[in-house]
Amino acid sequence: MNQELERLEERCLSSELIFDGKVVHLYVDRVSLPDGQSSIREYVKHIGAVAVLPLTDEGEVICVRQYRYAHRCLLTEIPAGKLDRSDEDHVEAALRELREETGATCRTLTHLGLYRSTPAILDEKVDLYFAEGLTFGETDPDDDEFLEVHRIPLSTMVEMVMRGEITDGKTQVAVLKVNEILRRRAQDSENAKG
């Protein structure tokens, strides 16, 4: 076992399901700490999710604006959604969310990595993707999903992130990663020219 993990790992002594909801499941666990003491950990289990940053050939991000009840405000976000099943293919889920929320399909889908939204209390993992070569059709949001689709230049989105106007974490991470990918592509293209 990794020595660092051995020094820092907390081991579960007991686990109790407190709330078993449709989307989340709340647990209270008693854990053994690395120094031998015990403590309580409250956490939420979540099936996982995907998020997609769709970029047009003109450099615009297709994003959605929707009311988030838990925060009681409107947020600008990239298309995203929870997995329908724990064994659902994440690429298929990303393509589904892209189509449902924006009406788009893509020629290229690049995995940007894994994002853990709130690791102290939530085990949700969000796989982030970058969609290019977009073709547009009709949106098909879920019955309880009300959102507006917007096109915002990537450079503007970067500035919105830096000014604190975009507060959704997955969107911040995806915007900054895609911006860096495009910067490196441009640099590689310049270097190839000589």
Feature locations, PLM:
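Short beta-strand micro-motifs in enzyme catalytic cores
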Residues: H25-D29, L74, K125-D127, E148
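Nudix hydrolase/Nudix homology domain
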Residues: N2-L13, Q37, V126, D144-G194
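Residue-level detector of high-confidence beta-strand sites
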Residues: S15, V64-Q66, L114
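Unchanged
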Residues: S39, G48-A51, T56, K82-G169
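Conserved Nudix-box catalytic region and its N-terminal flanking loop in Nudix hydrolases
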Residues: N2, E6-R7, R41, A51-R96
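Hydrophobic residues on conserved beta-strands that form the core of alpha/beta folds
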Residues: C12, L26-V28, I40, V64, ...
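Acidic, metal-coordinating catalytic segment for phosphate/diphosphate chemistry
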Residues: S14-A51, D57
